[in-house]
Structure formats: structure tokens, C-alpha cells
Amino acid sequence: MILKEQETLGFQSEVKQLLNLMIHSLYSNKEIFLRELISNASDAADKLRFLALAKPDLYEGNGELYVRIICNKEKRTITIIDNGIGMCRTEVIDNLGTIAKSGTKAFLETIDVKNSKNNQLIGQFGVGFYSAFIVAQKVIVRTRAAGASADEGVHWESTGEGDYIIAAINKPERGTEITLFLREGEDEFLDDWRIKNTIGKYSDHITLPIEIATNSENKNNNIITWEQINKAQALWTRNKVDVSDQEYKDFYKHLYHDSNDPISWSHNRVEGQQEYTSLLYIPASASWGIWNRDHKYGLKLYIKRVLIMDHADYFLPNYLRFVKGIIDCNDLPLNISREMLQHNRITQNLKNAITKRILSMLEKLATQNNEQYQNFWQHFGLVIKEGLAEDPNNSKSIARLLRFSTTHSKSMEQNVSLDEYVSRIAEQQEKIYYIIADSYAAANSSPHLELLQKKGIEVLLLHERIDAWMMNYLIEFNGKSFQLVSKADLKLDKFLNENTTEQKDMTKAFEPFIERVKKYLGDRIKEVRLTYSLTDTPAIVTIDSNNMTTHMAKLIVASGQNKPDIKYIFELNPLHPIVKKVSNTDNDIYFSEVIELLLDQALLVECGTLENPNQFVRRINKLLNHDTIVN
């Protein structure tokens, strides 16, 4: 190769230090160099297509555009070839001699096509080309602009050390040829399988065919044959009416290596101020890392069908981290390495739109296919519950997705929606009642439910660890506020229908007994009172509306903090035989043992444990031997 008019020029921006910083720090993984160079080649093809609309001669009789890759193991080189627009000497100096000057970006500004719906240019920064130096100790570029003569070819060469060589060459073919001379230790990229895998990961859906030489060193006839690597058509760019359900399923399985079909998907193209296409999937089951804080999640982010980020978590709130899929945008603010989003109003608007799209998709699934939604809830219900705290702007939509066990369903399965609950309540019922316990069995058999069950009032049975925390954010639904039935201020007057005069008389008669219990227990409890909300249970403990719930306190302890001090209200059932009997006794020993036992029973039901279970057992044994107490 004869070099003419050779010059050695310095880079026009911060030279060696900037190149060093960019090459060794800007990119998080080495294989990205191939993505960047293929993206540049795709841009070159798109530029040619655009300009050839007005000047067909630019095709020079060959309109079949491509990107081709040759790996030479003997010379330890990788060559990326395109037959796109190419560059003249001035463009080479401007685009390759300046860090962070993008030929694509300048092209857009020059012809003002940023608003063109058919514009497919993906380059945003001039640094993409320099990612070649991540794996290459030297890079040679041979290029010729479309429409120029063969002797107007340009040779560019650099080791990334702060300057470069530029010269004139004879190049019959238009387009650009980039040869990378690999550093020691980078021979993995000479393997065809490695190249194919990287292209499949990052550039599978570029519409330009990407081909690799299969016998570039054929010694007999020196004929190179080419194998196309990419599919060259992004499924999400097709009209959704032309894509079959099976194609959507196969694409999901290919993308995520999941053997199961997705439960649901949503394919949408949005046009307007911010144009983008999204293809969102709901998996059939949760991934192993869904509860691992370090587990990566997020959508695959494409810019003009080129994968920019494998886990663009910014577009998904944390409570929707199980959602998979892609988002393909025409333009997004990226950092200089194109590996990270720059968060601003545009990206926030996209996140809001995608979040609403997913919630709408789930609500549609719940309405149209209850069986599939129940399968979804079984795997992802706990994650959805996080959304009430994380995303208050969408709390109404999230609340509609919640499912509960209730006293009506008589099943541990969480299959009752709040809409269904509200549709069944009596007209005079102003609240949605719920109870929190450590297990379904404990919730379903709680003494706090006795009167409500007797009156046929449905109660939500909450028994998962997150529920106490969640209910701090679930305040109302369809105008109905939520009422924890273990709160002391539970108002059930409308449902009691008892003779209030009789209750008043009984309350007055029990006043001495209540005072006696208060005096005995002292400051161990907040208050002692009678309750008429029990039917089969002698006593319960409750908390007032200003106090932390028992299960919220458990969450605090589980997080490693000190146990909060909760003062319970001790409520006694005056209609229960045990309470009647102890209220009439003069035996102080019997009185103290029974009161202690009733309080321990109530605390055990409420808390699931006691501070001194051995003493509790001793009292039970002592009461079983009643003569011991009497004597």
C-alpha cells in the first residue's frame, strides 16, 4: 500500500491523558468496542441511503449495504468493513482527530433531520471509535467517500498515544475499513464464536446485514465467503398485527434464555415529542435474584436498534423489577461512553409512561384472565406490595392489583381484590376491615374477628411480613378507609344491636373489678376496660390509634433496631364465664393467677410469643390443679 501526502498530526483535544482515561476508564467491558464500530458502520450506511435519495449515483452501482468482519489469527487483527458513505481527508481529521466530535451528530445538525421519522443514525459521540484502543495497540483506517475517485482514499493510523498519521491512498471501493492490531492478551476476540456472540448480544437487530468471513485464508482460490450473523430485523420495529403470539414468545425465550412462555406482553410504539418503541414481558416465574439487592434488573435499552444498556433499571421502579423487555428510542441523553443514561425530564417522562403501561397491562391481565393473574400474584405479589410506598402517584392502580385472603373466601389463597371486597359490603359499612398476624391460621382464628364474623362482616387476613409496613401507605380505597380490627378505637356500634342500657348497667357493675385489675397490673399496661366485641374469648389486648402496631414493631426488631415499647390496652369480656368468676372472687392468689393468665393468653395471641413462657406454663399447670390455688 503506497502512502502519499503523509502527515503526522496531533489530536485536537487533551491528547494522551484524555485517551488514556477514556480507553481504560470510560468503558466497563472490553467487548463494547465491537458494538461501537458496528454502530459507526451502520451510521455510514444510513448517511449514504439518505444522501442517495437526492444523488443516486453515490451508490456507484452497488446499493447492497453491509458490515463485514475479518479475523486474522496469524496477524492477530480484526478488520471491520462497511460500504457506506465513507470519509474524505477533511472529514477524517475532523471526525477521527478530535475527541468527542461526532460525525453523526454534525451530519444531523447540517441537514436538520433530527425530526425525521426515518432517521436511523445511532452515533452520538466521537469517542465511540476510540473504544477500539481498549483491545488494540494500533488502529489503521482506510476510507473513501462515496462519489469520490479511487485516488481520493484516506489512510489514518494511530497507536492512541496522542498523535496520528494521515495520508492519501488509492481505494477503489467506497466506504471504510478499520483494522485493529490486538494487544497481548486480547486473542479471545479472534475467535469467530466470540465475535458472533458479541454481535448477537449488542447488534443483532441492526437492519444492516453483519457478515463474518468464513474462509478468509483460502489458499487455493483466495475467495472469501460470508456468513450473516445478525437477523437484521428488529421484531419490535414490525407492526404488532404482523407478529404472531408464537413469535413474541420465541423472541422472549431467545432474549432471556427462559424455557417458559411469558404470562403476558405489551408491544407499543409511541410517536410525538419523544418517540420510542417498547416491548414489555411479564415472566411466568420470579428469577432467583429478585430479592438480592445486588441483582441487576431493568429493560434492554436500544438506541436505533443498537443495544446501549443490558439492564437499564432507571426505566423501571424497583417494585416492577421483575418486568423484562426492551425500549428502543431515537434519541436519549447518554454519558460520553454511551453506557449510562443522563437522567433528566425526558428519561423521567419515559419512566412514568412505561410504569403506567405495565400497571395497565397487569390490570388487563387480572380482568381478562384471573387464573394467569393468580399465578402472577403467587410469584410477584410481595414485590407489587412494595409499590404503595415507592410510587404514591400510582397508588390507586397498585391497590387494584392487590390480592388478599379474607374471611369470606375461607382459603389461604390470596384471591380477593379490593374491588371485589367493596362490592360485597353493606351500605352502612364505612371501612375496610383487616387484621395482621404471623400466619394465615393465626389471622383467621384471631379473637378480634369474633363479632365481625358473627355479623357477617368480611375481614382481610394479612399474614405476610411486608403487610404491616404496606398498610402504612394503603390509606383508603374507593372512599373507604382501612381499619385494623386490633385497634382499641374500633367502632362497631352500628353492628352490635345490643341493649345499650343493659351494657351500661353491666359496665357500672364491673367498675370495682376493673379498678382492681388496674391496680394489680399497674404500668404494665396502658389501660383496662370492658369489651363487648368478643363472643368466645375472655380477654384481648389492643393498641390505640396513635401507637405502633405489634407487627410493625417486629419489622423494626428484624431490621436490627431496638424493640419499641408498646403499651397495650387490656380488654376483658364481661360475658365470659372466666371473667365473671374472677370478678367475684375474694381470693387474691386466685385473682392474680387468673388475671396473669388472661393477660398472657391475650399477649400470646397478639404477639405470637411471651417474654417468660415458662411462667405461663407454670400458671396453667397451677390452675389445672385448682385445689392448690384455693388452698
Curated annotation (Swiss-Prot):
Question: Does the keyword Chaperone belong to this entry?
Answer: yes
Report the Gene3D superfamilies cross-referenced here.
Answer: 3.30.230.80, 3.40.50.11260, Heat shock protein 90, C-terminal domain (1.20.120.790), Histidine kinase-like ATPase, C-terminal domain (3.30.565.10)
Region C: which residues?
Answer: 555-631
The annotated region (A) lies at: 1-338
Question: Where can this protein be found?
Answer: Cytoplasm
Q: Does the keyword Translocase apply?
A: no
Q: Could you cite one Gene Ontology molecular function of this protein? A: ATP-dependent protein folding chaperone
In residue numbers, the region (B) covers 339-554
According to its UniProt record, what is one Pfam family this protein matches? Answer: HSP90
Output the Gene Ontology cellular-component terms: cytoplasm
- Keyword set, alphabetical order: ATP-binding, Chaperone, Cytoplasm, Nucleotide-binding, Stress response
- Per its UniProt record, what PANTHER family does this chain match? HEAT SHOCK PROTEIN 90 FAMILY MEMBER
Indicate the family of this protein. Belongs to the heat shock protein 90 family.
What subunit structure does UniProt give?
A: Homodimer.
Q: What is its biological role?
A: Molecular chaperone. Has ATPase activity.
The name this protein carries in UniProt is: Chaperone protein HtpG
What organism, scientifically named, is this protein from?
Baumannia cicadellinicola subsp. Homalodisca coagulata
Taxonomic path: Bacteria, Pseudomonadati, Pseudomonadota, Gammaproteobacteria, Candidatus Palibaumannia
